[in-house]
């Protein structure tokens, strides 16, 4: 209530317009919140430059890194954002767990969102004193199984090397883009110069749900719909897309199968 949202415009390639971003600041700006990598278009946003611009206006920044952390080397110290968040399952860990990184000075200001054991220092009928960081945010018995599994997943990808993962996935993206562009009626959404290994597309007049369902019958896993980004779909003038997301365990042979599957579905309509 009382909060006004200002949306950063994007160009036809799916890139944020930095000039217009700079014009959005005013003395009432309290927070900049932006995704590091679009889970729909794959656009890698220039978050470091955006953080620097926000700090010129003394505005804190929250970065959603759910689509970035599994695919890019992320250094929160270098980015200098006040907050950086990501989910566990997208980085090959378990579901139901995520990470909030925050600068200590900001986390100290935030009240606990949940009560329970370990998150208090002293308690009486008159008042409660909260525990120090990070314990004031960890009420009750923690999900130590989930956190242990997530830590192991992070160790695994770091062992592979995030630079190696990013380079290989970029090779897959370029190969897949070339293969899909050769398909009649193909429309790929998101043509940013800096892009993660995500392809959102439509083929002719085939509904995205139909394409996804038929690809599933061929053993090809994709996502369909608005991908939790309805305002983006409205901006693109569509209801949804088919989305393929590539990872380090995918191969060019699988992309060949994927492209052949799309072509097979296309010929059904």
Describe every region a protein language model picked out.
Residues 1-269:
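Pyridoxal 5′-phosphate
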